[in-house]
């Protein structure tokens, strides 16, 4: 009788991928990157083990929004003090800190558990076209959409 394959830390092979975000839609890009970080693009995917790959996203400042989201979509954070809510539009966040915009979007699609935090640490986002991970010899990854 055959047993279902279960991945563990000893038999996981991780790759490094570079994804160019120039002209890509925020949500579509984020969902594909989240799937790669979780390892769902592999046949060895195991839900309780981190089987995902490392992802480097470049040109985060050239991400694309559909409709009026750049003006209308708001991001909120709170300082835990009375009246401490802060809001910023997606367009302002893209202009000020495009890395945080993409990181928040991708990490929001990962599980809110210790495993999800571990998977989120394999994400590297850069606003420009340069990244310091050339020693890892990352492969270019073409998105499906």
UniProtKB/Swiss-Prot annotation:
<dbReference type="InterPro" id="IPR005822">
    <property type="entry name" value="Ribosomal_uL13"/>
</dbReference>
<dbReference type="GO" id="GO:0017148">
    <property type="term" value="P:negative regulation of translation"/>
</dbReference>
<dbReference type="InterPro" id="IPR036899">
    <property type="entry name" value="Ribosomal_uL13_sf"/>
</dbReference>
<keyword id="KW-0689">Ribosomal protein</keyword>
<dbReference type="InterPro" id="IPR023563">
    <property type="entry name" value="Ribosomal_uL13_CS"/>
</dbReference>
<comment type="subunit">
    <text>Part of the 50S ribosomal subunit.</text>
</comment>
<keyword id="KW-0687">Ribonucleoprotein</keyword>
<comment type="similarity">
    <text>Belongs to the universal ribosomal protein uL13 family.</text>
</comment>
<dbReference type="GO" id="GO:0003735">
    <property type="term" value="F:structural constituent of ribosome"/>
</dbReference>
<dbReference type="GO" id="GO:0006412">
    <property type="term" value="P:translation"/>
</dbReference>
<dbReference type="Pfam" id="PF00572">
    <property type="entry name" value="Ribosomal_L13"/>
</dbReference>
<protein>
    <recommendedName>
        <fullName>Large ribosomal subunit protein uL13</fullName>
    </recommendedName>
</protein>
<comment type="function">
    <text>This protein is one of the early assembly proteins of the 50S ribosomal subunit, although it is not seen to bind rRNA by itself. It is important during the early stages of 50S assembly.</text>
</comment>
<dbReference type="InterPro" id="IPR005823">
    <property type="entry name" value="Ribosomal_uL13_bac-type"/>
</dbReference>
<dbReference type="GO" id="GO:0022625">
    <property type="term" value="C:cytosolic large ribosomal subunit"/>
</dbReference>
<dbReference type="GO" id="GO:0003729">
    <property type="term" value="F:mRNA binding"/>
</dbReference>
């Amino acid at each position: 009788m055959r047993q279902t394959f279960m991945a563990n830390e000893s038999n996981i092979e991780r790759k490094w991928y570079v994804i160019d975000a120039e002209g890509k839609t925020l949500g579509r890009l984020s969902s594909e990157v989240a799937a790669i970080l979780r390892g769902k693009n592999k046949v060895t995917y195991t839900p309780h083990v981190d089987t995902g790959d490392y992802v480097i996203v470049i040109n985060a400042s050239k991400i694309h929004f559909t409709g009026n989201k750049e003006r209308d979509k708001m991001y909120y954070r709170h300082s835990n003090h009375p009246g401490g809510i802060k809001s910023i539009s997606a367009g302002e966040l893209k202009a000020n800190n495009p890395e945080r915009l993409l990181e928040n979007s991708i990490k929001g699609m990962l599980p809110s558990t210790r495993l999800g935090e571990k998977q989120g640490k394999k994400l590297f986002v850069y606003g420009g076209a340069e990244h310091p991970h050339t020693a890892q010899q990352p492969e270019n990854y073409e998105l499906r959409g």
